[in-house]
């Protein structure tokens, strides 16, 4: 996927870029695989905001994605490559030999008309799904299960890719996009290849309104709030934060403080922690 850049005809088009969708199939989504979606807008079941800066945005239909790839030993043909408003990756509509249709994440290099399969004996080709124990060392994978038969949970974002670096006993070692190196059961399945739409990270929205279309509300600095609203607020004019270190809106230390649970079951599976900026 390439990007199209706008000329600065207006302040809103200055530095604005959009995805070039010329390679996508211009069709409505498969009706049997779509459903209406209630958007939580950052609220929990009591209506209390638990995630700030969310709300509004364009109305969307949810596309049901097959993260499990549990239709084994049956080939499927790629019918369309489509835009999905619910994620930055593209999705591909595949049709199996028995006529069933499913959406999958579109891997880079998979074209309309290609054949894919989920099998323990599948060849090492883009789009095929295999258990990690059956993959060769060095292969690039995405849509990785954390627990067998649960469905892919890791490496699903646009352009994301992990690498299989070692096999030992009941576990394989994966290098994840974050830089973390961890062990995963060799019975877990994954899909070969890199998630498509790799230029998504380089998109420039260009104006605030485009963030609102995506359902993102403005983020206000704590230092410009009143003291009742934020630990950094209050004072006459521009003031320091008034604490030894920055604080969250709820008074906890921020910036550089570890928030991971000290005793977590997966600590023994993580060989190298992710890169922390």
Curated annotation (Swiss-Prot):
It is found in: Plastid, Chloroplast. Gene3D superfamilies: 2.30.30.30, Nucleic acid-binding proteins (2.40.50.140), Ribosomal protein L2, domain 3 (4.10.950.10). Keywords: Chloroplast, Plastid, Ribonucleoprotein, Ribosomal protein. The keyword Transcription does not apply. Residues 228-254 are annotated as: Disordered. GO terms for molecular function: rRNA binding; structural constituent of ribosome; transferase activity. One of its GO terms (biological process) is mitochondrial translation. This is Large ribosomal subunit protein uL2c. One of its GO terms (cellular component) is chloroplast. The keyword Signal does not apply. Belongs to the universal ribosomal protein uL2 family. PANTHER family: LARGE RIBOSOMAL SUBUNIT PROTEIN UL2M, RIBOSOMAL PROTEIN L2. Its main location: plastid. Pfam families: Ribosomal_L2, Ribosomal_L2_C. Part of the 50S ribosomal subunit. The gene is rpl2.
